[in-house]
């Protein structure tokens, strides 16, 4: 196993995710507000980059299987480095949406391909190494968001924000993205990564790779469990703060602590759970994780105090770690090494669909039925997905955690 390459990829991933998070929350909604956007328009500006991922993660992964990981990863890092400069020229909401769509190519290209490289070199430790890579990315996201908010506050706050305020922030986004690109170039030019296939026409290999991976019910089922879990996570991110403040009567700071507790639990537990899945199998951890998410998610509308809500968030975070530490590694276990890029692209696409649909589905259900029924129905979806997963994985022919 090439630990030096994985460590370098984690460092690149931290810088890239820090840059991306700095550009997104809370700076992006505030920039859209400054440009005169209303609530619905702000939501589109925030979510449009996820749409990029839904449509382009799978093709990006498949392309990396053909032309090689190195070139594809560098293309993704170029989006991290150079797209942020376009924010300097934004003077309308429409331009902001267009730039956000372009910025989404950064994670759409780099994310699945970097995961494929980790899977390429991790050997029997796929669960642990993919979890470390993911946890470091989460750490970058955690660091970027508050730094963005702090910069806006220091530069005049929301009420005193000007175009210069956002230009300064996006200048730092660009510098950090350039740092990720430079470190990536240094790493990828020195290390050997998968070179891509050589037989047949590129178009034929592109189509056959996508057909082979997306036609495997086991890959789709494993990815779907991540998608379902991310649907509940997306709903929780959107509505837990609102519920905590408006129903439970907590402060905004306490609501932020609930979210932080969940994310930190996931980040710390993922490598441990990934290592466990390498030695003891992945299917059982995924099932346990779905249950671990479903129970506290259903109970949240019945809770009114900070302590009980915080404990529920910790359990949900642990469940998220159980699912996410095993699902990507299971997808890699089920695929031939030449198709790791396509597999991670399919995985990332379903991930994004789940995460994007969570706030939408949750919003409709909360609006129609209230928190109790809404959270209960989404919890039932988590539980109902378990028999589907077990049936799809039966007789999968893979020795879990040892592939």
Show where each model-derived region lies.
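Juxtamembrane intracellular "pre-TM" segments in multi-pass secondary transporters
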Residues: 1-3, 189-222
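Helix-loop boundary and gating motifs at the non-cytosolic
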Residues: 2-50, 220-225, 230-248
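Central cavity-lining transmembrane alpha-helices of secondary-active solute carriers
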Residues: 47-61, 260-272
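Structural signature of the two symmetry-related core transmembrane helices
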Residues: 71-85, 284-299
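Paired small-residue
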Residues: 94-102, 296, 307-315
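Cytoplasmic helix-loop-helix junction between adjacent transmembrane helices
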Residues: 99-138, 329-330
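Helix-loop-helix hairpin linking two adjacent transmembrane segments in secondary transporters
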Residues: 133-185, 372
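C-terminal membrane-cytosol helix-exit motif in multi-pass small-molecule transporters
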Residues: 174-195, 385-393
């Amino acid at each position: 196993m090439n630990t030096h390459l994985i460590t370098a990829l984690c460092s690149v991933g931290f810088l890239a995710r820090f840059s991306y998070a700095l550009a997104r929350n809370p700076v992006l909604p505030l920039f859209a507000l400054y440009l005169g956007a209303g609530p619905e328009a702000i939501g589109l500006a925030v979510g449009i980059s996820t749409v990029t991922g839904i449509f382009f993660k799978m093709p990006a992964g498949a392309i990396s299987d053909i032309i090689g990981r190195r070139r594809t990863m560098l293309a993704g890092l170029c989006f991290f480095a150079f797209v942020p400069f376009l924010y300097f020229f934004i003077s309308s909401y429409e331009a902001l949406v267009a730039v956000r769509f372009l910025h989404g190519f950064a994670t759409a290209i780099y994310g699945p391909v970097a995961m494929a490289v980790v899977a390429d070199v991790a050997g029997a430790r796929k669960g642990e190494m993919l979890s470390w890579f993911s946890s470091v990315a989460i750490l970058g996201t955690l660091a970027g968001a508050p730094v963005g908010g702090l910069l806006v506050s220091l530069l005049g706050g929301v009420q005193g924000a000007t175009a210069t305020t956002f230009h300064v922030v996006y200048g730092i986004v660009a510098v950090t993205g350039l740092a990720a690109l430079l470190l990536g170039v240094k790493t990828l030019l020195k290390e050997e990564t998968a070179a891509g296939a050589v037989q047949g026409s590129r178009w034929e290999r592109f189509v056959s790779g996508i057909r082979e991976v997306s036609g495997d019910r086991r890959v789709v089922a494993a990815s779907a469990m991540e998608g379902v879990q991310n649907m509940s996570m997306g709903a929780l991110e959107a509505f837990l703060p609102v519920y905590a403040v408006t129903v439970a009567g907590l402060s905004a700071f306490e609501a932020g602590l609930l979210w932080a507790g969940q994310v930190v639990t996931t980040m710390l537990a993922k490598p441990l759970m990934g290592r466990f899945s390498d030695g003891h199998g992945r299917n059982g951890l995924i099932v346990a994780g779905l249950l671990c998410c479903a129970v506290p998610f259903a109970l949240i509308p019945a809770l009114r105090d900070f302590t009980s809500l915080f404990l529920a968030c910790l359990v949900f975070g642990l469940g998220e770690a159980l699912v996410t530490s095993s699902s990507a590694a299971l997808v890699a276990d089920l695929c031939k090494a030449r198709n790791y890029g396509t597999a991670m692209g399919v995985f990332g696409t379903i991930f994004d669909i789940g995460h994007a649909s969570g706030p939408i589905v949750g919003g409709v259900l909360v609006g129609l039925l209230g928190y109790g029924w809404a959270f209960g129905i989404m919890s039932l979806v988590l539980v109902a997905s378990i028999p589907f997963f077990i049936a799809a994985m039966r007789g999968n022919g893979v020795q879990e955690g040892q592939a």
